[in-house]
Amino acid sequence: MARVDPAIAAPPLRLHNHDGFLFFFLLLLLFSSVDASVHSYIGEKFTPKGNAFILHGGSEGLYASLPHANATAGRGDSFIRFEKITFTRPEKSVENSKDTDSVLVQAIIFEVEDRETIGGSAYGGQRAICCTPDLAKLGACTQGTVIYRPSTQNPKWPQVLAATFNGKDLVTTLPSQNIPITRTGMFNLYFIYCDPALNGLVIEGKTVWKNPTGYLPGRMAPLMNFYGFMSLAFVILGIFWFSQYVRFWREVLPLQNCITFVIALGMLEMAFWYFEYAEFNDTGLRPMGITFWAVTFGTVKRTVSWVIILVVSMGYGVVRPTLGGLTSKVIMLGATFFLASEILELVENAGAVSDFAGKARLFLVLPVALLDAFFIIWIFTSLSKTLDKLQARRLIAKLDIYRKFTNALAVTVVVSVGWICYELYFKSNDVYNGHWQNAWIIPAFWQVLSFSLLCVIAALWAPSQNSMRYAYSDDGSEDFDREDSFSLIKPGPVSSKDARGSAGLMDARAAVSNDTTTSHDGDIEEDKRE
């Protein structure tokens, strides 16, 4: 009897997860990829992998159906539903077919922990997904079908569905049905055929994936409540900030107007994300309008935040009235960051994106990561110069607030680097997305971190009756730009009139000094005589 060794993983799983790991390695801010719960297939073709032809149909974390689920209301039950799945093969593939011929196309659903049950080999040889003639002769499987073994945890899984081309049929249909989910896990769907004669086969239709609480994928479901919490947090911050703003509106600085704008953008972003997730949960499809505005408000907020932190680090509005020649460079950097981030976020969030990130996304991630790094370097370089000048002029109040600001940024950068290291560890040890229930923490953390930094900045620069002491004052003692230009100005020739005036002034000062000295010496002599 032949010994059938289980395959550790199907080839497409290894390939795409490797791409996902590279994506997280290159991404400094990180986010998990997103799947829509309604997966549509529109003329998609199969890819050869080993001795099989494969199409990835979806991958989502699903929770088990709740006991006594209310099927009428659609709440409590968890399933994968196949709707109007049709396969069409090209006419040339049936030229040599006989009326008695039959060819299978199979859909296989398995939980990620059961991946070793897919595929096998005879006598420990090369693993294959489709049954080989040698295995068929030994009775281990049926030639032309996918090799799989029942799961040790759930004998009814993997679930395998089949559609058959009979004779010269050009179209076949996969029966519409629901696959109930009775065990919590990360489920994968693959469409597979083994006969090379079906080369050029295309698929049409859709599958619907549902959790007990709605259509949100399992690893995204906690984010809906998270964005609701963040919306409340921004409201609380907004109440504090706007109350201070109204009380001391006569003392408000331009910088504080910018912070007001960022807080308002944050409120809008969190509210739109919450409603986007709520709509997604109800319908299984992302609402394009809400998603677009959520992404745009978020991108504008991040761009404005970067620019504000940069110009504050340069001392704008506090120790210098303008940015001078740097204005155009700051605007150009901000505009480039906005464009790169907006494209990346729209690609990640608009529509159905596979759990396994494509290579094309790397080209969108790299510019954003490089721009982030450039912002950080420029910010800390500018802060160092500003702190040195404040310390040299002994501007204690401004120096104190800038030191606190620098410390807050430094802590944020250190925590960010630490979290990136954790992301790398998390993804490298979760190649098959087995820890999907905790994946939502990664994007949530970045939101919490940015909100925390915003709270610190709001506390440091909150409007108050003393706000004007942090404003730029044109008294000559703080004009950094003017001081920098002094060393570049060459003294001009002095006229004879000016020279005489200067000499006279120096003589007068010397006379006063001598009189004072004489008087002082006289007092000393008088004291001695007494």
Regions found by a protein language model. Give the residues of each.
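Generic detector of multi-pass transmembrane helix bundles and their immediately adjacent loops
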Residues: R286-E530
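Soluble extramembrane domains flanking the early transmembrane region of eukaryotic membrane proteins
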Residues: A2-P6, H18-M220
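Structural signal for hydrophobic/aromatic residues that build the beta-strand cores
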Residues: F187-F191, F242, S313, L383
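Extended, basic/acidic-rich, low-complexity regulatory helices/tails in eukaryotic proteins
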Residues: P11-N17
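Hydrophobic alpha-helical transmembrane segments corresponding to the first two to three helices
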Residues: V208-M332, F338-L339
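Residue-level marker of positions within ordered structural domains that often coincide
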Residues: V112, C194, R247, V318, ...
